[in-house]
Amino acid sequence: MALDAAQPGFATRAEALRLRSWKLGAGQPMQVIDQFAEAGFTHIVDDRADVHIGSRDGRFYLGYFPNGRPGGVDEDWVTGEGWVIAVTGTAIVPGYRMSFGTETPAEIIAGVVAQILATSQPL
């Protein structure tokens, strides 16, 4: 393929791009929250209507922040962060944390949560 340096950008045919439709928009957060109906999780809705869900052993946390997550002492807001999922590790294996924007489709978060819950086992 020859490159024409005189032309800025690139050119291609629409067929070559193989355009797709992608899931967009926040969706319904209850698709995520409803997965925690069993008694092994605590639910808290705070005064900002943020939802906090945790496992009774304290190792799993899910936070839903429809208007963005509030920041720490040095920051006003962590803008755009709508979902936080964290699993605390052990003395041997580290845990993990992930966050998603306020406009991440709830269906995608629900899929991630379902996978995490499927891997957890009572001791």
Predicted regions and their residues:
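Negatively charged, low-complexity tracts enriched in Asp/Glu with abundant Ser/Thr
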Residues: A2-R59
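Generic detector of ordered, mature protein regions
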Residues: V45, A49, G54, Y64-P66, ...
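Intrinsically disordered, low-complexity regulatory segments enriched in Ser/Thr/Pro
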Residues: F60-E107
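Intrinsically disordered, low-complexity regulatory regions enriched in serine/threonine/proline
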Residues: A2-D4, V93-L123
